[in-house]
Amino acid sequence: MTERRDNVSHAPDAIEGPNDGAHAEDTSPGFFSLENLGVAQVQVVGGTLNGYVIGYVAVYLLLYLTATECKFTTEGACGGRKIYGCKWSGTTCKFENPKCSEGSDPSDSCKNEVAYTSVYSGIFACAMIVGSMVGSIIAGKCITTFGLKKSFIIVSITCTIACVVVQVAIEYNNYYALCTGRVLIGLGVGILCSVFPMYVNENAHPKLCKMDGVLFQVFTTLGIMLAAMLGLILDKTGASKEEANMAGRLHVFSAVPLGLSVAMFLVGMFLRESTATFAQDDDGKADGGMDPNEYGWGQMLWPLFMGAVTAGTLQLTGINAVMNYAPKITENLGMDPSLGNFLVMAWNFVTSLVAIPLASRFTMRQMFITCSFVASCMCLFLCGIPVFPGVAGKEVKNGVATTGIALFIAAFEFGVGSCFFVLAQDLFPPSFRPKGGSFVVMMQFIFNILINLLYPITTEAISGGATGNQDKGQAVAFILFGLIGLICSVLQFFYLYPYDANQDHENDHGGEPVEQKTYPVEASPRN
């Protein structure tokens, strides 16, 4: 296994020509071959679950808002679910404990409780991410202790339990149980985000390794789009929202992750064992396995730092704010919330498909740095500055911001999101990847928490409260996203290089060290 990883090109600045490696092309499996699909299937199931869990927040908040508005026109829809604070009175659905008297002018001191407050929304959005952060911390130990295949089963069982807890929480409208379920499913997702990319990185054919690697993000965006599409269907079709059983719709919406968790269990049961194994004896040097203690944390400080920078690029440039609050953002731009959310997620998926052919031609480093720079510019110059009140008229602002969000998502999916999970592995030597990859994934979840918790609260505060001009807070947020992204892009241009096995090899034999800026591994098309 290690020999395959160390067999890299020695032409630092060259890309293989059409006649180079012809023999490898003749013997390598096709992208859609059964051999390759046997490896890539983990990306299909794991990525889709990861994406659906991410896209869950925006849709759930939208459906819950409808459930708590108490605008139902039938007794069954209103009185049947008193847990949402509604009661049927004569011929009208009313709030069970209204803060406002009939005919009063709703002011800041008179508002019936509808949906979640910005604080509760932020906590709900962060619950899964907190669990994911914990999961990513233990992912490395899980991999070295149980192996990759058994880790799949652990993830599936954890996610299944979490989905059951969420269903119970919906039935009784229990906010704390809902957040508990989200934390549990986040725990599974945190392990998943390290285990699945590592399995593909270690078991896919070298020619297809990076193309298979970006599939995790492709199917993550598919899962996000599926959540948005189902949300649109539940919000717009069938019985009208004024007559619908919204609790039932929330149950249906929350059942999809349960099915994906069961599918993941089946994949884990029948998946072939990974070629990557780790030593389990006290000395860490059992035959046939890599030593997980071969490198100490101190030896990997610089790759760990650059991993944290890539995680910052992934999360602090605004993608999660767009994903979780797409309905609100698109509503501020004059669109229907559920339709706007679906269009954003559909575009997110379509653009991610472009990463597959790009990965066969360009390196992960080239794609990541170029696209992070472009995405940051979109945040700053199209989504931020023009949206600030007074800079542009309403029609111009909406048009420019919509274009900016579309281009930002495209740039992000072309190279930032698609390459991140591959780089999280490639930055480190094979034996350190359980620790190093888990650390990088953990950092992106930490940044994710900051965005999910602070974005709604900060934008509302900057805008002057819930009744203020929300464009102001949104503009300031995207300006900051753009500036952070540009700083990270500069650091990555000078210092982001995947691990080079040849450097260790030459140092072990007394040769001259290979300079970090000329890593031969980066010249290979599979990187």
From Swiss-Prot:
Assigned protein family: Belongs to the major facilitator superfamily. Sugar transporter (TC 2.A.1.1) family.
GO MF term (any one): hexose transmembrane transporter activity
GO cellular component, one term: membrane
Signal peptide (from-to): none
Record-linked Pfam families: Sugar_tr
Cytoplasmic topological domain: 1-43, 140-151, 197-213, 271-299, 360-372, 425-436, 497-527
Residue spans of biased composition, Basic and acidic residues class: 506-515
TM regions (residue ranges): 44-64, 119-139, 152-172, 176-196, 214-234, 250-270, 300-320, 339-359, 373-393, 404-424, 437-457, 476-496
Protein purpose: Facilitative glucose transporter.
Entry keywords, A to Z: Membrane, Sugar transport, Transmembrane, Transmembrane helix, Transport
Alphabetized InterPro entries for the sequence: GLUT, MFS_dom, MFS_sugar_transport-like, MFS_trans_sf, Sugar/inositol_transpt
Protein name: Glucose transporter 1B/1C/1D/1F/2B
Localization per Swiss-Prot or TrEMBL: Membrane
Species per Swiss-Prot/TrEMBL record: Trypanosoma brucei brucei
Extracellular side: 65-118, 173-175, 235-249, 321-338, 394-403, 458-475
Membrane-related topology note: Multi-pass membrane protein
Residues covered by region (Disordered): 1-22, 506-527
